[in-house]
Amino acid sequence: RDSRLRPVVMGSHVDSVPQGGNYDGLAGVIAGLLCLVAQKQHGYAGSLPLQVVAFRGEESAWFGKAYMGSGALFGKVSADDLELKQRTTGETMAECMRKVGADVDAIRTQQMLFDRSRVKAYLELHIEQGPVMVARKLPLAVVSGIRGNVRHNRIQCFGDAQHSGVVPRWLRHDAMFAVADLIMRLDEHWRVLLERGTDLVVTAGVVSTDPAEHS
């Protein structure tokens, strides 16, 4: 085979999240490997080379930021990202990457470690993680792209801590009411954007107060 032929790359991610669904990510990696096995068993090379890739660190659940594995390949991981800590062990991303043999120095300087111009096409098989295909009774679908991920890890609303039993409404500045108002305004903006044809989803995650000043 001509070594100048650009390969088709198949794969997905090998990390998941709690309740991510059976075979989240892994289905795409296994599908690619099975294609390679089938090619070998049947002596079929195909018109283009086939390569399989497995990404790690694609979910945001562990470091608070998504696409770390693929981002590292394309020079998108910053020095600040490498200092993010793993939620269960407290190790930095740099430490975790170094443990598995990644070139952390190259990643820190945002070098391009993978030339995507050398790839003919990318194909990823993935499970359905939402209700749309089930609701529409679709056994499978072709997806041309996925939503990106814009995350604000910490949004703070400040108020005044007061005695909850004696301070009247006109003298209160409750931070929790401001948080509730902010979330409702986000929901309203979301509705307006959907009506304009924008495709996005919005989620408000963990809400908490200062343990020492609940009131």
Task: Write out the residue ranges for each language-model feature.
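Glycine-/small-residue-rich beta-strand-loop submotif within the FAD-binding core of flavoenzymes
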Residues: 5-8, 13-17, 75-80
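Walker A/P-loop NTP-binding active-site region of P-loop NTPases
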Residues: 61
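Alpha-helical metal-binding/catalytic segments enriched in His/Glu/Asp
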Residues: 10-13, 19-58, 151-157, 167-189
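A non-catalytic alpha/beta surface segment that caps or lines the substrate-entry region
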Residues: 1-3
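Short, solvent-exposed loop/turn and secondary-structure capping segments
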Residues: 21, 64-65
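A general structural motif
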Residues: 5-7, 47, 118-120
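Midchain, well-structured core segments that form catalytic/ion-binding scaffolds
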Residues: 58, 67-68, 74-215
